[in-house]
Amino acid sequence: MGYNKSLRYSRHEGTTCVIDNHHLKSLGSVLHDVRRKKDRIREAEYEPIIDLADQYMVTEDPFRGPGKNVRITLFKEIRRVQPDTMKLVCNWSGKEFLRETWTRFISEEFPITTDQEIMDLWFELQLRPMHPNRCYKFTMQYALCTHPDYIAHDVIRQQDPYFVGPNNIERINLTKKGFAFPLTCLQSVYNDNFEGFFEDVLWPYFHRPLVYVGTTSGEIEEIMIEVSLLFKIKEFAPDVPLFTGPAY
């Protein structure tokens, strides 16, 4: 096909097609303009919904709120769980707890060294199967507002339990409403009298949890239980610097 003079002109009479760099645009900028236009359309659709939603308040996860999380791992232990039953995790009776087959105590020292304000206390439970290729889920039941003189059973039957959260980790908030935890030096109390630390220091201001765990398996399973307490400490800046130097 040779040169055709008529190709220089458009199909419209009296006009010509002029192509120069002033009328060219990169494809990326075109796509960017399309995306921005879609975002503006989407924002215009959500504006009345957002105005209505601003009139309501929703609760957030208090574990992810302000403050610093300090963990104290009490023990790791292997338990044998029978089918259709649930075992008590911890009876809070001092350093023995409920030792069965193998127990390892982790924290010998209390992690909070100074007088700090305790905002929240969490009971964290991590469960792991001890044998590979086991297809079952972990179940759990717990009670908070039990009578102080109530003696919990070591084994109960499963009745309407719920499944443990993602990654086989479950956290329970132990904070009592209307109770403020005093500023005390917890490290000395923890190190001097571990057995009386829970009864004298924690349980007057926080709930004493009775936690039972089980499995959906039809066989006897060995599970690893790791029990921790998470203290949420209020972080605040001192009025005057206590130290001077580049490290502070």
UniProtKB/Swiss-Prot annotation:
Q: What is this protein called?
A: Granulin
> What is this protein for, i.e. what is its function?
Component of the virus occlusion bodies, which are large proteinaceous structures, that protect the virus from the outside environment for extended periods until they are ingested by insect larvae.
Q: Which GO terms describe its cellular component?
A: viral occlusion body
What broad taxonomic lineage does this protein's source fall under? Viruses, Viruses incertae sedis, Naldaviricetes, Lefavirales, Baculoviridae
Q: Which residues cross the membrane?
A: none
Q: Carries keyword Glycosyltransferase? A: no
Q: Please give the superkingdom of this protein's source.
A: Viruses
InterPro entries given in the database record: Polyhedrin
Q: Which UniProt keywords apply?
A: Viral occlusion body
Q: What family is this?
A: Belongs to the polyhedrin family.
Q: Look up and give the organism this protein is from.
A: Harrisina brillians granulovirus
> In Gene Ontology terms, what is one molecular function of this protein?
structural molecule activity
